[in-house]
A protein has these predicted regions:
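Internal alpha-helical transmembrane segments of multi-pass membrane proteins, especially GPCRs
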Residues: 2, 37-40, 67, 125, ...
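Membrane-interface helix termini in secondary transporters
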Residues: 24, 51, 55-59, 144
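Hydrophobic transmembrane alpha-helices of multi-pass solute transporters/permeases
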Residues: 1-21, 29, 201-225
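Short intrinsically disordered, low-complexity coil segments enriched in acidic
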Residues: 1-7, 54, 153-156
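Helix-loop-helix hairpins in multi-pass membrane proteins, especially solute transporters
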Residues: 58-210
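Hydrophobic alpha-helical interface/terminus motif in multipass membrane transporters
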Residues: 22-25, 110-111, 145, 225
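Extracytoplasmic
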Residues: 2-40, 46-50, 103-104, 108, ...
Length: 225
């Protein structure tokens, strides 16, 4: 549980620092009004994609879902750290937010998997305590990054390393217990028997790809108009 708490803490801290870095970045780009556009788009895409992310966890496994989400999250941070304009920043921010939401969902699913119904509310409350302290310490750390640690880009670059070091061991723990469960016969993996093309069609239907796309497009148009 302590490792889960650390991961929640790092997500909360990075999110708080990112707020300061974002304002500084758009000020440098002389494109401050684009902040709200990037935030709206990232929130819509990240929120809608929670639906297929939950499906990924059930089909591929917790460890695989965590690694895929971490990859998207880190890729977004790298683009944010290396971007040269508001458009590339917005693209990186969408990837970053999709990965962030997915990682947060996976941690919540793990808590639900490992806690009893009687203690689940307490477990979720305990895991959310980092957001209390980072609400005050995060902006101070973000301002320190901007003023004394090489600028706002390092606010993102540093967490590429920190988050990878924090989350990859957790994926290893997930995989270890999954393998242990297989050896103990607690559950069995069955081969699908589908071809590659059949698998693509199957997963597109399972993840409800068309409706996810239409939902993102519809909500985006409604918020941008």
């Amino acid at each position: 549980m302590h490792r889960i708490w650390i991961c929640f803490f790092l997500l909360a801290l990075e999110s708080s620092i990112s707020t300061i870095a974002q304002q500084t970045a758009y000020a440098k780009f002389s494109s401050a009004p684009a902040v709200s556009t990037a935030n709206i788009l990232a929130s819509i895409v990240g929120g809608v994609l929670k639906l297929p992310v939950g499906k990924v966890l059930n089909i591929w496994g917790r460890a695989e879902g965590l690694c895929a989400s971490l990859f998207v999250y880190i890729l977004g941070l790298i683009i944010l750290a290396a971007c040269d304009g508001p458009s590339s920043y917005a693209a990186g921010y969408v990837l970053y937010w999709v990965g962030y939401d997915a990682l947060y969902l996976i941690l919540q699913v793990f808590i639900a998997d490992t806690s009893g119904l009687r203690n689940r509310a307490f477990a979720f409350a305990f895991a959310s305590t980092p957001f209390i302290c980072t609400a005050f310490t995060g902006p101070l750390a973000g301002q320190n990054f901007v003023d004394n640690t090489g600028g706002w880009r390092w606010a993102y670059g540093a967490f590429c390393i920190i988050q990878t070091a924090a989350f990859l061991p957790l994926a290893g723990v997930f995989k270890y217990y999954e393998t242990k469960g297989l050896k103990m016969g607690l559950y069995q993996k069955e081969r699908s028997g589908r071809t590659v093309m059949q698998s693509l069609v199957h997963y597109f239907i399972e993840f409800d790809g068309m409706h996810v796309f239409l939902l993102i497009k519809g909500i985006s148009h409604a918020n941008m108009s």
